[in-house]
A protein has these predicted regions:
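Electropositive, beta-rich accessory/interaction domains or terminal extensions
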Residues: 1-178, 182-191, 196-197, 231, ...
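A conserved acidic, glycine/proline-rich C-terminal tail/linker
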Residues: 192-229
């Protein structure tokens, strides 16, 4: 969990800025993920310069120019990434050894190529959001703890109502996050096999997705688009604007 991060039009700064393009993936989404290679979840990425990777290098200067200029992209070194492998070794994300490890055991042809992007390489929308109450409701339905990281949200809300899935009622509305950022809630978030994978162990538990499909039409959380950029911090307030 990040203490703070910049949310821009293309998503959360630094989110999913690296991916491995696979020759065996479908053309619509040509990147390898844990749906294909579950062991990817056992590799722990860490920015070499966490502070520089949390916000654009000229954020303060850009925001000081009315009405607010889009900040510059980070320099490559700002986003340098190291990866802790399951064996305990630490390798740079661009080390060919890492590409080789991630390709082990894959069925069929998967030639992997590292990609770095200045925008988040998200599946669908720039920002995903889910409430802690929704996670707790799913826990109650399953009768066991559920790691919130299964849902891979950019933003976790603690709703005053205390009701699970209440964020679905925000679709079509705008939210003020913190003092400046403004997002439009676009649609419910359709879920796939990823929520059935334990983010700590990589173990597959199909009952998680089955329950969300049975009880909630396979939706959990919502997708958002950023209307006004800004920095978010843990504990920031959330206001429904309209």
């Amino acid at each position: 969990m990040l203490a703070e991060s910049f949310v821009g039009f293309s998503g959360v700064f630094g989110d999913r800025c690296y991916a491995f393009k696979s020759s065996g993936a479908r053309k619509g989404f040509p990147y390898m993920n844990a749906n294909v290679q579950q062991q990817m979840l056992l590799y722990r990425p860490k920015f070499r310069h966490p502070g520089r990777a949390a916000r654009p290098p000229n954020l303060d200067e850009a925001m000081g120019i009315a009405p607010g200029v889009t900040p510059a992209n980070a320099e490559p070194e700002d986003m340098a990434l190291d990866v802790l492998t399951p064996s305990g070794a630490v390798v740079a994300v661009d080390d060919p050894a890492l590409t080789g490890m991630l390709g082990e055991g894959l069925r069929g042809e998967h030639r992997l190529t590292l990609v770095r992007s200045d925008r988040a390489l998200t599946d669908c929308r720039p920002v995903s959001l889910i409430s802690l109450q929704t996670v707790r409701q799913i826990e109650g339905e399953l009768g066991r703890p559920v790691d919130k990281r299964r849902f891979r949200a950019n933003i976790y809300l603690d709703l005053a109502s205390g009701n699970g899935f209440a964020e679905e009622g925000l679709v079509g509305r705008r939210l003020r996050l913190g003092s400046k950022a403004l997002v439009a809630v676009l649609e419910r978030d359709p879920r796939c096999k990823m929520i059935s994978l334990d983010p700590e162990t990589g173990e597959h538990d199909p009952e998680v997705l089955r329950q969300v499909a049975r009880a909630h039409e396979a939706f959990a959380g919502v997708y958002c688009a950023v209307l006004v950029e800004g920095v978010l911090s843990v504990g920031d307030s959330v206001e429904v604007v309209d």
